[in-house]
Structures are given as structure tokens and as C-alpha cells.
Amino acid sequence: MKFAISSSILSQRLQTLGRVIASKNSMPILDNFLFQVHDNHLELTASDSELTLHTTLELIESDGPIDFTVNAKTIQDAIKEIPEQPLEFTVDPDNLDITVTYQNGHYNLVGQNAQEYPLTPDLEGEISTLGADAARLFSGINRALFAAADDPLRPVMNGVFFDFNTDGLAVVASDGRKLSCTRLLDVTTDTPASFILHKKPANIVRNILQKEVGDVTIRFNGRNAVIASECYDLSCRLIEGKFPNYNSVIPKDNPNLVTLNRTAMIAALRRVLIFSNAGSPLVKLHIEAGRLVLSTRDADYGRSGEEALACQYEGQPMNIGFKGTLLMELLNNLEGEEIVVQLADPSRAGIIVPAEQHEHEHVLMLLMPMMLND
């Protein structure tokens, strides 16, 4: 049996599917990609037993249906070394010997029986179905992932929370010290629903959506979710448990408002952090009318750094401390030229938002303060 396909398109899809393959699988067959040829199309599948990614490609030609699996790393590494050209696969249906022929050579591989490959069960029970714009969903997940925890004692914090309600879809992650929340205001539902996506599938969805256009369909029940874009279908197990009430930790009354240039803030913060204590990089923010002063000190080595930035400030003069490395993370995961820092007092969380929000979107970052010694 033979079929032909573009080398660059196949390589691109295999590279994406390869992110699913675990370094150590409970089932040896999961070290393989599943190939299914029918109706002049090639369906490719990768799985680690809890996460399955599926894509369909159009073939240049084929002379019949066949299913087989082949080692993922071998085929992935081999195909990516071939420049764009048609590849011809010849598969012996009896012993699954595979020959991949290209312009200047060929590869010989041995496949395995596709019947050994585990099938992904369909969603059952009460299923919620919603849609979202691929580009905005990418932005929400991209902003959230850095804030997710890595805490075996609190597994619900180790992923990205999707909260659908009448106000829109909130894409949230937090590790207890920092929080990222992106609200997609045009994704609404009359029946509130939510789920927590593990970091691994969230990372894969982010990588997929970076190149996708149009709408994404999200279907989920209490245990599993299916996220379908134009080119990929991802099925995965969800994190079970209740995500904390993130709205309750966001201060509502923040009369002190600092507006300043985000890029200038990042550059100044990077410079003063050189002089901070490596174990506890505390950065002090002194805010007064017209300027914000960043300062750090490392008493162990007798060094310190200070830099002033121009800003617009509405409020009383204030000193507040933050962990500098976390503040840098927040600023790097925001967009736009100007940001607004919203503060209540030095003991409460600081909120950072873009000065201008995108249409149908509201972005908010939160950072818990550190105690100042002076």
C-alpha cells in the first residue's frame, strides 16, 4: 500500500504531536504515532494516556486504506531533515515494513499493529459546549501559564482555570503569590461552568493556537475536555477539585493609581535587581507625585541600587515592597506601552493592568507584597 504527502506539512504536524509523547510511557505503544490512511487523508494521533492530540492531513495520493503505528522520535527526527518535497510511504500490510522514499534516498522502518493503540473515549454525561476566538484564547492561556503553581499538595493550583459565566470567560492561574486573569468578554453563557486544565495540555493548546485563526470549540464534562481548532483536536483529563475563589483575593478599592511606561519599568527593574539579595530579591517602590523610585539592597555584600522613573500618580505618597523577580515576570507577560498599578496600601496585593485594554478583553495581574524593614 502506498501514499504520498508533503514533507514540510507532515514534519510540522509531527513536531506538534511530538510534544504529547511522554519520556516514559506506561504502555510501549504510546512511544509511537498512530497513522490512519483513508479517503485520501492521513489521520495522525499522539497520546500519553491522559492527553491525546489528533490531526488530519490531505494526501497527494493514496491507493487504499491502512492503519499502523511507528516510533515517534524516529519518524519525527527523520522527516524534519528532509527539505520540502513529496514523500512516498510504502507499507507492507502483512508485516508493516515501511519504506519512506524521497528525492535522494529512502528510510526503512518497522511499524506496529494499530489495534494495540488505545482509543480515546467520547465525552459522556452532561457536556458543556462553548466557542472562543483562537487568537484571544491563545493570549489568555499565554498570560496565565507563568502564574500556575507546581505544588503537589495543592493540585488544583497546578493548571489553568477556565471559568465560564454571564460576564465572559475568565482564564486564570495563580500560585498564591501571583495571579493572572484574562476575561474574554464576548464568550458568555447562561449556565456557569468551569474546569482546570493541566499545564501540559495548556502548553500544547497555546502552541497550537499561536498559528490558528477562527473559532475554537471547547467541550467538557466533569472529568475530561475536548478542544478543537481548525487543524487539531485535543482530548485530555482534567484536574479534579475546586479552584479557589480568585475574585475574593482581588482588592476592590484601590485609590492609589500609578501610570507609567512598561518597557522603562522593566529596564529599570532589571538594572536594580543586579544589586538585590539573590535569596530574597526585595524591591522597594517609593511612589510620590510625578515619580516612582525603585531601590534594592544586599546587606550581605554591602551593595545597593536605586533608579527613578517618571510616572503619573493619583494618591498619597507610599512605600511598598515586591519580590523583584516576580514583578519582572508580571511585567513581561503584559502587553502595551503603558500600565496602571493599582494600590490600596502596603499590606495588600498590588494590581497591574494595561492602560488600554483590547476590545472584548480585560487583563489583570496581581502580586502579593513583601514586608519592608524600614
PLM ranges: what are they?
Residues 1-374:
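Structural preference for solvent-exposed beta-strand-turn elements
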